[in-house]
């Protein structure tokens, strides 16, 4: 469970974190029996506002800057057994720094918006294989009846890629040594995405070693160009 940020009344603190102050979190964690079955242990944070450093069992696990993006830390080597201590230190410059902050200000003028600091998204643990999918980028190319897949992993080569429509496989392929693959969608299976008909294809990626990720995409391209009158705009 993620606690309320210290600026909120429900936190019981009711204090606006100042740029020269630290916000600390500390708790003991016990993993469910049989949770770690080998491979790697990842500690995920949905978002922490704004800059943070993480310790596991007193050892620094990593740090992150930016209050709006998720991040993950590999804590496998820092945990022995099923129990560990997690500590987090947060700083938040709000409008005294150069980081993205939205409407947040230490001194609000003309708007009733309280700054928020610390953990504000879900925190969770994940057990993954040694060779796991770190990131996946899907780039539709409707003008070529194709889709480009790019993934990141320790060993991204020879990953199986499957594209399905309405539960049936319509394209299959494998990634090269760089983790890339371009698959052609048969013309009779091509269906463009639109706001009126937001059709999505299903895609599954299976790495050598067993890690599997399922996602989806729509066939649509966006860009900047000239219309029939010669005016530049989104197309």
Task: Kindly give the residue locations of the regions a language model identified.
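Beta-strand-rich binding/interaction modules
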Residues: 54-56, 145-175, 181-183
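Extracellular Ig-like/FN3 beta-sandwich strand-entry sites
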Residues: 38, 81-83, 156-158, 196-200
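N-terminal carbohydrate-binding accessory modules
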Residues: 136-137, 204-235
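A structural microfeature
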Residues: 62, 171, 211-213
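Short, aromatic- and glycine-rich surface loops/edge beta-strands on solvent-exposed regions
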Residues: 85-88, 197-208
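Accessory beta-strand-rich segments of carbohydrate-active enzymes
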Residues: 15, 19-132
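Surface beta-strand/loop "capping" patches
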Residues: 127-156, 233
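Exposed aromatic-hydrophobic patches
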Residues: 70-77, 180-189
């Amino acid at each position: 469970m993620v606690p309320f940020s210290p600026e909120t009344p429900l936190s019981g603190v009711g204090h606006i974190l100042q740029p020269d102050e630290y916000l600390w979190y500390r708790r003991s964690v016990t993993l469910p029996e049989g949770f770690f079955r080998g491979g790697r242990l990842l500690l995920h944070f949905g978002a922490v506002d704004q800059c943070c450093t993480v310790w596991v069992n007193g050892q620094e696990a990593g740090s992150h800057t930016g209050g709006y993006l998720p991040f993950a830390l590999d804590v496998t080597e820092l945990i022995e057994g099923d129990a560990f201590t997690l500590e987090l230190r947060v700083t938040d410059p709000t409008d005294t720094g150069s980081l993205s902050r939205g409407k947040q200000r230490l001194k609000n003028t003309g708007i009733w918006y309280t700054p928020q600091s610390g953990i504000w998204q879900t925190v969770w643990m994940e057990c993954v294989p040694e060779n796991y999918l770190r990131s996946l980028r899907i780039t539709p190319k409707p003008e070529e009846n194709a889709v480009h897949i790019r993934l990141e992993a320790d060993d991204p080569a020879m990953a199986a890629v499957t594209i399905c429509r309405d539960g049936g496989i319509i394209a299959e392929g494998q990634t090269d040594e760089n983790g890339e693959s371009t698959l052609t969608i048969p013309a009779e299976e091509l269906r463009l995405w639109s706001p009126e008909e937001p059709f999505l294809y299903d895609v599954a990626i299976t790495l050598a070693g067993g890690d599997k990720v399922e996602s989806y995409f729509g066939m649509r391209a966006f860009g900047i160009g000239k219309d029939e009158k010669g005016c530049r705009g989104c197309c």
